[in-house]
Every structure is written in C-alpha cells, then in structure tokens.
Amino acid sequence: MKRLLLLAILLSSLMPRYMAQTLDIYFVNAPKSVLPLLDRTARLDLMDLYASGLPAKAENLYGGQSELLEKTSDYLMLKTSDAGTWQLKVLTAGHDTLLVCIQSVEADGVSSRISVYQNDWKMVKRDMPHLTNEKFVKNSTEVTDFDRQRLMPTLLHLPIQATWHADEPVITFCLSLDSLPKEYINLAKELTKNISYKWQSGKFVAQP
C-alpha cells in the first residue's frame, strides 16, 4: 500500500497544478516549514497504518509520538505531540484548491493559528474570520450579575481554539476553558458560545 501511495505522489509531481490531487498527497508533500515534526517516511507510515485499521502512530523528529487521529477525503487531524494538534482541510474556490491548516497548541488553554496555502503549499492571503473574545460572550439567565462581572476579565483573555468539522467545510471557534478552575468552568460555559462559519462559494459564511 505504501508503495502505491508513493508512486501516486511521484506521479503527482508531473501533473499540472490545476489537476486534482488527493489529501494523502497534500499531506505527504507538506514542506518542513508547514509540518516540521514528521518526515515523509513517517507520514507514509501513518497513512498506511490508518488505512489498515491499526493505531496510526509514528515517532516524530523530537523523539515523541505523533498520531493520525482522523482522515476523510478532504480532512485530516494529526496529534503532533502531547501538547499539539494539526488539522488540514481541502477547500475549493472556483477552479482553485486551498489547503487550510489549523495548528493548535495547549498551554494554559488551547490556542489555534490558521494558515492558508495554494495546492503547491505556497502561502496565500485569504480573508479568514476575525474574532475577538467579546464576540463569544452571551447573556445567560443562569448566571448572576456578580458571577458575570467576576468572570468577564478572565473570559476576555482566554485563548481562542479553532476546529474543522470532518464531514463538512465548517470551522468552529470557541474560547478554550481548559485553564479555568473547575468551579468556574460551568459558569463560563453558560456565558460563552461557539461561533461557526461554512465555506460557501469561495468565502466563509457565518452560521446561525
């Protein structure tokens, strides 16, 4: 299986840029600047193990374990390390293909960074949803004014986490509550909301 995939990757290098490629090929061809922890051999091993229904784990370049958690025809989620994940979503915009990556790191909460590339892994500038912490705060009759005032300064400084939906071109943002004391988490959930956008006709559209 690995030989067949490697052959497909080699053949893809001979194809014109506009021709369709598979998510597997994009993943394997991602440059070191995009995915530094895994070399090509490790990536091929991960996909081979995943396709075989086995735990898709491989040693990364830092000596730790990386794991391929989920893969569809246009989505991939990788646990790069104990504190990091990397997601890839393949989007279409007319005749163009965009590769949108979410790099998330856990340190006092989960913080995400989004990068957009052409199908040859050249970075491009695209209008991505720009969200401030205030937009995640909602009114709630379940939280007293005292608790709201007490939590607000903390909510406004929490990191923002982003996640792709595996089965549709939807990205969801939320405030990462992992760093909050346990007694505050339920209150924070009552005071905050998730915000989702769907990729439609070459742009992100806010979802109700």
Label the predicted regions.
Residues A20-L91:
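Terminal domain-start segments
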Residues G94-S104, A166-C174:
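Acidic/hydrophobic-patterned starts of short beta strands in beta-sheet-rich repeat architectures
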Residues G64-M77, Q118-D127, W199-K203:
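Surface-exposed loop/turn elements that mediate protein-protein interactions on large endomembrane-trafficking
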Residues D96-T132:
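Mid-length scaffold segments of soluble, non-membrane domains
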Residues M1-I25:
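Bacterial Sec-dependent N-terminal signal peptides
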Residues L78-K79, S104-V110, E183-A188:
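Short consensus segments that form the blades of beta-propeller domains
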Residues D127-K198, P208:
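Short aromatic loop motif centered on NTY/YTY
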Residues A83-W86, V100, G109-R113, L155-P159, ...:
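Short, surface-exposed coil-to-beta transition loops
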